[in-house]
UniProtKB/Swiss-Prot annotation:
Protein name: Homeobox protein Hox-D4
Source species: Ateles geoffroyi
Name of the gene this protein is made from: HOXD4
Pfam family, one: Homeodomain
MF-aspect GO terms: DNA-binding transcription factor activity, RNA polymerase II-specific; RNA polymerase II cis-regulatory region sequence-specific DNA binding
Keyword presence, Membrane: no
GO biological process, one term: anterior/posterior pattern specification
Bias (Low complexity): 222-234
Composition-biased stretches (Basic and acidic residues): 245-255
Annotated region (Disordered), positions in chain: 28-128, 212-255
Primary location: nucleus
Length: 255
């Protein structure tokens, strides 16, 4: 039995075996010739018992001129490359496998960005947060002006009537300055307005009509009439007292 090159070229510490002479005396080992690394002294292909797997690089000659060739070793357990600690070294004529390429170094700009903002989410996952609408955005904030403000609805905006709506309302006001409830509902449905809007428009239009025709206000006339009646009632007793005073004066002169 020929000693394999695995035991000779291994980097492990040699175990405590008996000297080589004892093996020679016992007939375990034959004489080693010049074709030690070749396959000339071996009758068939020999595969050493490899402890670590060897990747399949194709059938390559193991020796430098022997007829025998070595096939790939079957994979076992660990996955270290040959030639490492405890691995099988290549023969002088066998090409060495190329070492794996190192990973590409990251760009300095990208690394600086990643270190400066570690909490930044990936570009593909953008978070969409719903907009928060607070109560003070919905209502008029006047608590600082009026402390008794309870947060009611803001003042209603003015109604913008269209040209067609104003034309129809003016036509109706030309014939009837006062509307009945039934007629007001009909106009509201026709012009797509509310009954309250029709009522307010007619009130404002009547005030404008009175101002254009210079008619006295009914409230002003009632107040002026009441004041004139009170003045007349106060002056009447004084006029009645004057003749009585004159009669009394004549009576005194006659005496």
């Amino acid at each position: 039995m020929v000693m394999s090159s695995y035991m000779v070229n291994s980097k492990y510490v040699d175990p405590k075996f008996p000297p080589c002479e004892e093996y020679l005396q016992g007939g375990y080992l034959g004489e080693q010739g010049t074709d030690y690394y070749g396959g000339g002294a071996q009758g068939a292909d020999f595969q050493p018992p490899g402890l670590y797997p060897r990747p399949d690089f194709g059938e390559q000659p193991f020796g430098g001129g022997g007829p025998g060739t070595r096939s790939a070793l079957p994979a076992r357990g660990h996955g270290q490359e040959p030639g490492g600690p405890g691995g099988h070294y290549a023969a002088p004529g066998e090409p060495c496998p190329a070492p794996p390429a190192p990973p590409p170094a990251p760009l300095p700009g990208a690394r600086a960005c990643s270190q400066s903002d570690p909490k930044q989410p990936p570009p593909g996952t953008a978070l969409k947060q719903p907009a928060v609408v607070y109560p003070w955005m919905k209502k008029v904030h006047v608590n600082s002006v009026n402390p008794n403000y309870t947060g009611g609805e803001p003042k209603r905006s003015r109604t913008a009537y269209t040209r067609q709506q104003v034309l129809e309302l003016e036509k109706e006001f030309h014939f009837n300055r006062y509307l009945t409830r039934r007629r007001r509902i009909e106009i509201a449905h026709t012009l797509c307005l509310s009954e309250r809007q029709i009522k307010i428009w007619f009130q404002n239009r009547r005030m404008k009509w009175k101002k254009d025709h210079k008619l006295p206000n009914t409230k002003g006339r009632s107040s002026s009439s009441s004041s004139s009646s009170s003045c007349s009632s106060s002056t009447a007793p004084s006029q009645h007292l004057q003749p009585m005073a004159k009669d009394h004066h004549t009576d005194l002169t006659t005496l």
